[in-house]
Amino acid sequence: MPAFDLTAPYSPKGDQPTAIKQLVAGVNDGERYQTLLGATGTGKTFTMANVIAQTGRPALVLAHNKTLAAQLCNELREFFPNNAVEYFISYYDYYQPEAYVPVSDTYIAKTASINEEIDMLRHSATRSLFERRDVIVVASISCIYGLGIPSEYLKAAVKFEVGETLNIRGQLRELVNNQYSRNDTEIARGRFRMKGDVLEIGPAYEDRLVRVELFGDEVEAIRYVDPTTGEILQSLESINIYPAKHFVTPKDRLDTAVQAIRSELTERLDFLNTEGKLLEAQRLEQRTKYDLEMLGQVGYCNGVENYARHLAGREPGTAPECLIDYFPKDWLLIVDESHVTCSQLQAMYNGDQARKKVLIDHGFRLPSAADNRPLKGEEFWEKAHQTVFVSATPGNWELEVSGDEVAQQVIRPTGVLDPIVEVRPTTGQVDDLLGEIRDRASKQQRVLVTTLTKRMAEDLTDYLAENEVRVRYLHSEIHSIERIEIIQDLRLGEYDVLVGVNLLREGLDLPEVSLVAILDADKEGFLRAERSLIQTIGRAARHVEGVALLYADNMTDSMAKAISETERRRTIQQAYNEKHGIVPTAAGKKASNSILSFLELSRKLKTEGPDADLVQVASKAVEALDDDADGMALDALPELIDQLEMKMKEAAKKLDFEEAANLRDRIKQLRQKLVGKV
């Protein structure tokens, strides 16, 4: 029996069955690298889901940013409602790494804010990998950073079993050793309390409580309990409580690590003094001895991750354990948007080492701090036994290592063809474009325009606005939430044209866009390379009347290749449609997803007014806060804060952490208003 239960209202169509069959056969035959070359709108995620389901392998789906990871996770959870689809990204809301700027003699201490909801999801991912095989973890590049030793994490788990006789004091001590804190007043994640014969634990990976009921020293019952209502949700025969932190260091290993750090410090001080670097030596000695004192007394210090190599007992230069090491041996890696993601893997290591070298050279850290690092590219690929690369424009390296194992997915189940590509001269390009925009706007269609520079984009936006075109400008200084709202407004018809420098961002799947205009298409460079052009042209590939206009005076190699590839895909789709009698139909994709739900709710409130429920009123307060916060009644603020907190938690559960962070900031503002009015 397969481990995964794929649920979908449709079956594979077009190129999907062939691609799925080829990829599944490759995985089963032990092929190390394969590539799914899938055009925009061909259902690559559904193909990925089928490959996972038919191979039955625990899978890691790697994305190059957390927004794309959240979208993939939401889609895969819809396909696999009965399996464990987990989300693993960096748990920092804010992160400023430790750094030193020699030129200005400026030391920047590490500052960070941890998102507890994301931390819970990370723990949930590793717990699932220990307890079941039907696991899909959707992760960002942060999964290549150190994550403790899986065997130590598993060994440290505290087990409870019905009918078992316990040494309850010993069990409580183990929970404390696993970094759970006792709080008999308020129970929460990472805490426990003991009242009479009832032990309640807030696991690091659950939003439910675990209640262990005792009769004397015997476990009488184990239950999952709702933390708010106290309602019994489920009875269990046994349970493992995993540590509250992934980094678990037994006492004997901690003692050994402290000795190793002392030894390295002595050696490094000798070197610095010999080199005449007396200031650096003094700085290093003072900082490290303080850290050693903290480690010896409480087992922790600020910046403890810099001693990770010693705490893990690793040899110098060896790779750290990371999320990959929690997977069983037969796991499957799927790299989404591989043309971007693969290049990021090596870049993460290089950037980390450059910063650490400065800290080490100037006496802020021991040389072993360099081993607190992400995996190198080659280390990552050594750990990845079987890989499927997924991209509309796979990179040369992916295609090279895949060899003949490339599955083509060009045909769209909707029958929609790739855009018609036209090349027009640059003379009079703006006026020509204006006419095309007016034509599309009259048909309730949308337009994307990409320029080479920010200045060009600004000037074009101003010109179009002066000519009564409803236009917006998308640029790098716009924050994530506002960026999402701009894209949402385009889809909803609040305006007709979106202008930007680089509109290749993943997630820009806009079925309403029928025209993509690329200005200065013949200016060779990153933004006008073959892959970039194909990606940009593909933004119009979801519309039945899709057209891409390339304004250029010369035909570059990149343009020729991009046009040729688009025409090839268009010809294949056309032949398929004629053979099967398919009439192209636009994908009926709604202008909403988990990331945009809050924005939709805000719009709804503008028309519903006082008839909206409390949660909606709270959301409206967010919209009005900057303009009318001073006019709010004092007694209304606490209720609004409560409702916003509920909304924030709902957003986090939907993996919409950008919305959650926005709500968190608004709550903070409301609290400040409340304090100021009391």
Curated annotation (Swiss-Prot):
A motif (Beta-hairpin) lies at residues 91-114. It is found in: Cytoplasm. It holds the Pfam family ResIII. ATP binds at residues 38-45. Keywords: ATP-binding, Cytoplasm, DNA damage, DNA excision, DNA repair, Excision nuclease, Helicase, Hydrolase, Nucleotide-binding, SOS response. InterPro entries: Helicase/UvrB_N (IPR006935), Helicase_ATP-bd (IPR014001), Helicase_C-like (IPR001650), P-loop_NTPase (IPR027417), UVR_dom (IPR001943), UVR_dom_sf (IPR036876), UvrB (IPR004807), UvrB_inter (IPR041471). PANTHER family: UVRABC SYSTEM PROTEIN B (PTHR24029:SF0). It comes from the Bacteria. The UvrABC repair system catalyzes the recognition and processing of DNA lesions. A damage recognition complex composed of 2 UvrA and 2 UvrB subunits scans DNA for abnormalities. Upon binding of the UvrA(2)B(2) complex to a putative damaged site, the DNA wraps around one UvrB monomer. DNA wrap is dependent on ATP binding by UvrB and probably causes local melting of the DNA helix, facilitating insertion of UvrB beta-hairpin between the DNA strands. Then UvrB probes one DNA strand for the presence of a lesion. Residues 638-673 form the UVR domain. One of its GO terms (molecular function) is ATP hydrolysis activity. The keyword Transport does not apply. Residues 25-176 form the Helicase ATP-binding domain. The beta-hairpin motif is involved in DNA binding. PROSITE patterns: HELICASE_ATP_BIND_1, HELICASE_CTER, UVR. The gene is uvrB. Residues 429-591 form the Helicase C-terminal domain. Forms a heterotetramer with UvrA during the search for lesions. Interacts with UvrC in an incision complex. GO terms for biological process: nucleotide-excision repair; SOS response. The keyword DNA damage applies. This is UvrABC system protein B. Belongs to the UvrB family. CDD domains: DEXHc_UvrB, SF2_C_UvrB.
